[in-house]
Structures are given as C-alpha cells and as structure tokens.
Amino acid sequence: VLCVGGWLLPLGQEDSLADVVATYRRLPAVAFQTVPVDAQPITVRTAVTGGRTYVYLVNDSPWQTEVSLAMSTPATCPVQDVAGRRSFAEVENAGPAASWRVELKPWDLVAVSLPGESASVRDVRVALPNDAREELAARLDRLQVRAMALAQQPPLDALDNPDFELPANTDGSIAGWESDARGGAELNVDPMTPDERNQVVRLHSAGGTGTVLRSAPLNVPDTGRLGVWVWLRSTQAAAEPQVRIALEARDRGRVFYRYATVGHGESVVRVGPGWQQFFAQFDDLPLSGLDDLRVRFELRGPGEVWLDDVALYSLNFAEPERVELFKIITSAQLKLQNGAWSDCLRLLDSYWPRYLEAHVELSAAQLAERTAQRPRPAAPAAPPAEADRGGVLRKIQSWLPSRFFR
C-alpha cells in the first residue's frame, strides 16, 4: 500500500506523482524477487510472468541517480515501460553480457518489461550527484553539533523570580509566586549564608495539611519536555519532610498534573541539612491544548523545607539519552563511510535527529567551527577494516564526557 499523508493523492501534486502511480498500478500482481546487490539508494526487483520478464527500480533518495544494470537478455530485447508513459534507452549488447542504463528522478519508480522469461539482472551500479555525500556529511555535522549543544542549553527565561531575590509584594507574598490559602510560604535570608542578597523560601507546616508554592503561568514549551531544577535543604533530619516537585496545568479543560517526590519515603532522594540540587524531568507535555502551566512545590504534611534558585529547561537530556543520540550519529557515520546512502539518510530522517533539527538552534560560529574541522569527504571505497570502524567509534567517544565510559 502506498500512502502519502493519507489515503488520497496530495492535492496539487498529481502531476509530479502521475508517473509513479501509473507505474505502480500497472505492475503485475505477482511476487517480485530482490536482486541481491547492495546498490543504495536503488532497489531492483524482478519477476517472470506471462512470457515476459519484469524489472522495476526504486530510488529511495532525494537525488537524481544514474543506474547501470549488467544483464543477461535475449538477442533481441526491446524495453517497454509498463505504464506506457515514458521512453527509455535500449539495451546495449543484448545477449549474455548486456547492459542497460536508466536515469531515475528523486523518489522515482521505473518499471519495464522485457521479452521472454530468460532475462536476468547480474549486477547494479549507481552514480549519484557529486554533492550527495557532501550533503549527508553536512547534515551529520549539524546533528553532531546539536547533540553536543544539549549539554550547554541555557535555562528558560520563563519564571519572573526564579532566585527569589525580588522584594516581597506589599502584602508580604512572594513576587512571581503564589501560595495556597494554608500559607506556610515565606521569604527568609538564608541562615547558612546570612546575606541580604540571598533570599530563599521557607515552606513550613505545623499541622498535617502541608503547603504549596506555585509559579505564575508559564508558556508551554514546544519541545514536549520540561526539566525543573531546584536547590533544597531541610533541618529536620529526624522527621524529614516529603516534597513534591510538580507541574500543573489544564489540558483541554481537564487537570494535568505530574510530579516527582524527594525527601521522606522509600526509593527517593533524601533532603539533607545542606543545600543540594534536585531535578525532575517531565517528558510527556501535550504539544497542544495545554494552558495555565505552572511549576509547583508541595510540602506534604508537617515539617519544614528551604528552597532556592529554580531553573527550567525545555531541552534537558539525561546522559543515557545523549549516549543514545551519539549511537545514532555513530551508526549514520559508518553508513556514510560504507556508501549505504539510504541507511544513512533514514537515520538522519528518524525521530530524534528531526527533533534536534526542529528545536536546537545553531549559531553561525558553531557551524563554521565544525565545518573547518571536517575534512573534505572522499568517495566511498571498499568496506573499512575493523580498525577503521574503531577509529570512528573512538572519535565519537572523544566528543562525550569521560564519565560516559567509566
């Protein structure tokens, strides 16, 4: 089944797809066999039926390609387009050492029929434009720079008072933040570093109800991700409070609520007497229909906790995630070296590379630096030896922090 954005042909593109669709419809309804030759981005399949041999070629790439087939054919071998829409060159030297040349447009499908049932394809040679490899190498460069840039993403400028240094409102409430009716959220000078420029928030509750501090509404990030960093400490080691780092919003009128727990409880990180940075990652934010998004900190039950310096990140990737990204890059690099054009392109067009292209901006300086580091690519030779494969892996490894490989 062929589907392009739905069950019907895309409106306005019928002319560009007419040859492909007509060819597909006229293929005989029999099983075709793939010619066992790696000639990416071209796939060649053949079938014999009704006293004729059918050959079709698919160009799985955005480049115009020239294909040469080494064949065995009858002595007289006219080439017929199965759709009757296009004219092709004749077979050269028809017979046991015949050859046939054909040019395929980007994403093209060509199918022809040959007389008799004895014709066969022995080999496939593909010639791509000179800039095809350069184009793939450039995309790989940009992907590498984007992946490395994930470790240096700045926090979002989304909170009005992330470090709590703004003066309190006239009613004593915390600027840029809201507490619930139970109270229990107040500004204090950090007693561990008494400095009037180092204000922190003290959340406290004497009863069992706890308290909540929430931010003003935020713009919903278009990445579908939001990481919350915050510094916490508690002086109550004997009765350590439980704290939730949470997001709240309305998702098409329904409550949206996600949280991570620290402090008291099993399998959670403890909140000690010294300042410690905590992190909660939320990866399932809806890309539409979400509004009134807020960060919230909940003191669950009685106790006391101090918090400071809240930071939000929309592109925070954990180390295991970055390692997986570099595995994709490594694989694409090896595919490119081996001339596996379609495999390389398929990796570059997969979800996470496309995601980084959409959300990680690159400066001209970053691109220029990476381009200057890359040698001009040569044409692919024979498959590299194992030592060469290790060289690529060592190169990728050198881009990652050493802690990835302990």
Predicted regions and their residues:
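Aromatic/acidic polysaccharide-binding cleft in carbohydrate-active enzymes
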Residues: 1-26
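C-terminal beta-strand-rich structural cap/linker in extracellular carbohydrate-active enzymes
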Residues: 94-134
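Beta-strand-rich binding/interaction modules
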Residues: 64-90, 241-245
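Acidic/polar loop patches that form or flank catalytic/metal-binding clefts of enzymes
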Residues: 8-14, 29-35, 67, 79, ...
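Short, solvent-exposed loop/turn segments at secondary-structure junctions
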Residues: 8, 14-15, 59-63, 109, ...
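Extracellular and organelle-lumenal recognition/adhesion modules and their flexible linkers in secreted
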Residues: 127-406
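Carbohydrate-binding surface patches
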Residues: 38-74
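Edge strands and adjacent loops of beta-rich recognition modules
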Residues: 29-42, 195-197
